[in-house]
Amino acid sequence: MQYRTLGKTGIKISEIGFGCGNNAVLMVRASYEEQVSAVRHALDLGINYFDTAFAYGMGKSEENLGKILSDLGASPVVSTKIRLEIAADLKAATIEAVDAGLKRLKKKSVDLIQLHNRVTVERSPGTRFSPTPTDILGRGGILDGFKEMREQGKARFFGFSGLGDPKALHELIDSGEFHLFQAYYNLLNPSAGHPVPAGFGALDYGRLIDRAAGKGMGVAIIRVLAAGALTSSPDAGGGSSPEPLSPGSDYALDLERAEKVKFLVDGGIKSLTQAAIRFALMKPEVSTVLVGFSNVAHIDEAAACSGAGGLAEDAMARLRKLWDTDFGKLRS
């Protein structure tokens, strides 16, 4: 396992991170014995970064991870995320949410806390609260809650999920206040790290990864497998929500796009999964690639990508042609 520095934090984390989310279900629905076996195996392979959240099983993922790490006597780098409801006092709501997460994790402190809500230019009119940059950066806002947690010794660093309006996400990055963000980045939508043309079908994140690295932030890649579209068993994928995590990346469309990148599997790359992970690791600005696992074999497949090198230049040239034409939908 190879390691990279998490931005300006100085923390060394594994190139492959253990995603404890809903899609792979392991840390939410599997038996305790299966979960312990998987976590122990990941630790033995050198994986030292675990990412969880309240939203994963309504706290079950945090509870399961906390118990397992306690039982194993292990102390890897742990990041958890909070999802807030609209509140008159966002600072207080943030503090309350972080404290609740620590209780579920059975920890007095955590390495990283992150905001899980989408961030938008204007507050969402729907039932799910999407804060604005002002809600986060303003006086008495979410950032102040994170800072209070740091002052109390309950969190070392903080970040956010890079979902929502790209303009709002760029504003958070430009503030220089955060240590990490989670980037939506994969072979089917590379816009957080590569230029895409006007009219590209998926949301253009405007090279957020490069912008964040310029501010000294660490970058954790999410949805590297496009909710399962970039795996050997895409029929089992699709995520836990009928709505796509990122606009323009609904599962049916991603399955069509994935068909056009299957040329990446050759003698040197054994699976589309490995091609996707190795692609994400090509950017030096990336700190870790978060992968969700359903079993121990999946952990081995992902871990083998660390140190294996990136995609060949001719493969990258073919990918760029696909991106430049939105997978054949635009004229080159």
Give the ranges of each region predicted by the language model.
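CE4/NodB-like, metal-dependent polysaccharide N-deacetylase domain
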Residues: 93-114, 147-152
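Short amphipathic alpha-helices and their capping/turn segments at secondary-structure boundaries
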Residues: 1-9, 66-70, 94-105, 168-174, ...
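Conserved, mostly hydrophobic/aromatic
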Residues: 6, 18, 42, 50, ...
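A short, structured active-site edge motif that brings together acidic residues
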Residues: 75-86, 114-115, 187
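Short, acidic/polar
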Residues: 29-42, 90-104, 164-172, 276
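N-terminal binding-site loop/beta-alpha segment at the start of enzyme catalytic domains
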Residues: 1-77, 95, 186
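Short, well-ordered coil/turn segments that N-cap beta-strands
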Residues: 11-16, 46-49, 73-76, 107-111, ...
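Beta/alpha (TIM)-barrel catalytic core signal, keyed to glycine-rich beta->alpha loops juxtaposed to Asp/Glu
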Residues: 58, 118-331
